[in-house]
Each structure stands twice: as C-alpha cells, then as structure tokens.
Amino acid sequence: DGVYFENGLLKEWPSEGPELLWETMELGKGYSSPVIVDGRLYITGMDEEGTQEIFFAYSLDGKKLYQTAYGVPWTDTYPETRTTPTIENGKAYVISGSGEIVCLDTADGKIVWKVDGGKKFERMTGKWGTSECPLVFDNKVIYTPGGNQTTMVALDAETGETVWKSEPLGEHSSYTSPLLVMNNGKIKIVGVTGKSVFGVNPETGKIEWTFRDWGRSPEDMAKGFESIAPNTPLYDNGRLFVCNGYNMGSFMLRLNVDATKADLV
C-alpha cells in the first residue's frame, strides 16, 4: 500500500540522485513491479518473441538465479506482461494476460501447478486482457475471470483445485486485483468488474453485496465504456474508495457493521 515501516530511510534523494547498484535489460516488455522476499527479487517479463511470459528471480546484487516461462500473454492490445508476483510460503503465484493461474517454487522456479483459468472458467475480459495480481489468503488463490459461469474463484494454493466459485454477474472483469479487508473483525474480499463493485465471503464465495450505480451517462454506456477500473480500491475504517478511468469518476462506499452491505457515502 505504499507505506513502509523500515528504519533509516532517506528523507530526500541526494542532489546527484541515488546510486545505481545494478540494472538488467533482459526482462522484455511489461508492467510488473518487483517483489523482494527473503533476499531475492522476483519480477515478470516477456521473451523476445512476445509469445511467453517469464518469471525471473535475482539476488539482491543483480545476479540472475533463474527464469521460467509460465504462460501465454495477452495477444491483442498491449501484449506486455501485467501481473506482479504474489509470494507466500516459498511459492510464487502469477496470472498471465490470457488468464492462466500459475504456482511456482521460488527455490528453483519450477512450476508446481497451472490452471488455464481463461478457458476453465470461461473468462470474459475487456480489450486489455487479464491484469490482476493474485490474492493469496487462507491457503486459497483468488482470481476474477468474470463472465457468465462465475465472477470470482478460489483455488487451493497447494494443488490448484477449485475450492469455490461465486455466482456470475455476467460482466467483464476489470483490471484491478482482489482486496482483502477486515471490517469490525469480519474478513471479506472486495472485487471489481467492468460494471460493479462487490463483496465476497472468503469461506464460501458468496457475493454478499454489489454496487452498480457508478453515475455513468447513457452516452458513455453506449460507447462501451466499462471494464476500465485501473486501480484496486482503497480501504480504511469501513470505507472503500473506488476510482475509474476515462472520465467515469470516483466514489466512496461505506460498509455496514458485518460488511454484508455497502452504501454510497
């Protein structure tokens, strides 16, 4: 969330800028952010041909430890890799632009399991493909395919087997990642589609509330302006702040006591 609790951080950069320790030019195109866990840096990239997404591991002095091709990128507009890896208990979880959910062993980069979520769950996405990062919680990997079969699914983090599927909203997925929130001791998952914000029970997958009144004009809806939520909602003290792109505006919701309902503030 952009908040750091480390000691000794610089209050400002030196006038000549921070010292460059190392760099690499072998990642290919992509929008992934680096993740540093247990003295290693993990990031996703692309091969030179643009046909495979690649999971990279580096030591903190810049030595490449391994790379693993794990999935097929989105092949339409902007086919660059999207997902930032989620690291949990010695495993890395990534989602390809075509909707493959993949678990890798961080020790050697070998694929532990792989599920073609785009095909299995009949994914329905916008014109820029799948861009979410996996949420890992309670030994479950959360993914939002959208569409007419389901909206959000949970996979077993160890095996990739389906744990639950939520009901379908019949809407495109967005470009946000699932958000885990705790409201008055109740843990919920908040997700976003192209038309809705919704809350999910993490134990059962039941969608407990939806919010669709985004204030979009009929003209915008006629143009097909949906599925463009770019940022995961922000949560604080029972409130959710949701933003959208292309002049669609932003709004704030307030969860009720047990987080089974959300109303516009």
Summary of predicted features, one role per range:
Residues 1-265:
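Noncatalytic, solvent-exposed loop/strand surfaces
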